[in-house]
């Protein structure tokens, strides 16, 4: 269906971005590790997408490159892992960090992600390790790791509320999300920075 979008960013409301292509606005759900890399509103962006059809919704998930999208597709094939949980996984750690955690069988790192218990972490390691072999080890290389840069957008008065809302959307409970943000909140910081630091602190 829709595999790639090239258009102007109209609005950024993590983890959602609205991209206008040919007069049509597409709402795209993105992992926060990809969201951080987006240009500012009003600028052009290219996003690789995966289209998910449910009984109650049709959703687009977006990524900065094909490798991240491939990993997302492999994740949602795992028993007990749907698109929302896969999005949370790739928001809590970069694609390369996840690949490294699986290859090193780091259950402790995976269970810190929202919605991941010990059994799910162990299942991910077993199933994803086999899939990585099937991809001939070419899914990612160390050089492909994401470099998270500080967003240039100015902080807003409701940055903390936006950060909490984004964490809830990623699977954290409201009280837990509020606590995570309050620990690292400070004046004049954008919501994207708060989200990134909250996720880092959680790991």
From Swiss-Prot:
Cellular component (GO) terms are: cytoplasm; Holliday junction helicase complex; Holliday junction resolvase complex
Please list where the region (Flexible linker) is annotated.
Answer: 143-154
Kindly report the protein's main subcellular placement as a broad class. Answer: cytoplasm
Record region (Domain III):
155-203
Q: Note the InterPro entries from the entry.
A: DNA_helicase_Holl-junc_RuvA_I, Hlx-hairpin-Hlx_DNA-bd_motif, NA-bd_OB-fold, RuvA, RuvA_2-like, RuvA_C, RuvA_C_sf
Which stretches does the entry tag as region Domain II? 65-142
Q: Name one GO molecular function term.
A: four-way junction helicase activity
Homology family: Belongs to the RuvA family.
> What's this protein's name?
Holliday junction branch migration complex subunit RuvA
